Regions:
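Short, conserved beta-turn/loop elements at beta-strand boundaries and strand-helix junctions
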Residues: 31-36, 63-67, 127-132
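Residues located in well-ordered beta-strands
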Residues: 27, 37, 54-57, 123
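Short, intrinsically disordered, charge-balanced linker/junction segments flanking boundaries
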Residues: 125, 130, 134-142
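Short glycine-rich, low-complexity segments
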Residues: 1-23, 41-119, 138-142
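Short beta-strand-centered aromatic/proline hotspots
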Residues: 22-30, 120-127
Length: 142
C-alpha cells in the first residue's frame, strides 16, 4: 500500500521511526508527497494536538481494525475534536504552514530533535520556528 493513499479523517495507528512511542493514534488531516499532519488522539480517545511527520519515517499504518474503531468511539463519546487548521498564508511546506499557524494562534508546540533525543516545549517567538520561549509544565515562560 502506498501510504499517501490512506484515507483522510479516519482513525489510524501509525508506526514511525521518528516518534518515541511504539505507535500513535490519529487522523491524517493534511498531506503532500513528502509530509503529513496528523490530528493525534491518545489511547483514551482524547484530542492530543497535531503531529507533523515525514512519510519517509513511517513504516506501517493500520486502520479499520477493532483498535482504531475503539479509539474512534471513545473520541466521539467524549465529544472530542481538533481545532481546524486554517493556514493564514500558504507556505511551500506543511511544516512551515504548521509553524506559522502555531505562531499566529499562540499555540504551545513540542519540537523533538530526533538526532539528539532533545525536546523543547514552548511558544514560538517567530513564525519560522527558529526561536522558542520555553515553558514548564505549568506553562510558565522562562
Amino acid at each position: 500500500m502506498i501510504f499517501q493513499e490512506v484515507p483522510l479523517n479516519v482513525v489510524l495507528t501509525i508506526y514511525s521511526e521518528d516518534i518515541d512511542e511504539d505507535y500513535i493514534y490519529g487522523k491524517i488531516v493534511m498531506r503532500n508527497e513528502e509530509e503529513v499532519i496528523i490530528a493525534q488522539i491518545n489511547d483514551k480517545g482524547e484530542s492530543d494536538g497535531y503531529l507533523y511527520l515525514q512519510w519517509e519515517g513511517i513504516y506501517r499504518i493500520d486502520y479499520e481494525s477493532s483498535y482504531e474503531e475503539k479509539i474512534e468511539r471513545l473520541y466521539q463519546a467524549k465529544n472530542q475534536y481538533h481545532e481546524e487548521l486554517m493556514f493564514p498564508k500558504k507556505e511551500d511546506t506543511l511544516l512551515k504552514n504548521l509553524l506559522n499557524w502555531a505562531f499566529c494562534e499562540k499555540k504551545i508546540v513540542s519540537i523533538y530533535f530526533a538526532d539528539s533525543d532533545m525536546e523543547v516545549e514552548g511558544y514560538l517567538k517567530n513564525a519560522q520556528g527558529s526561536q522558542i520561549a520555553q515553558v514548564d509544565v505549568y506553562e510558565a515562560v522562562f
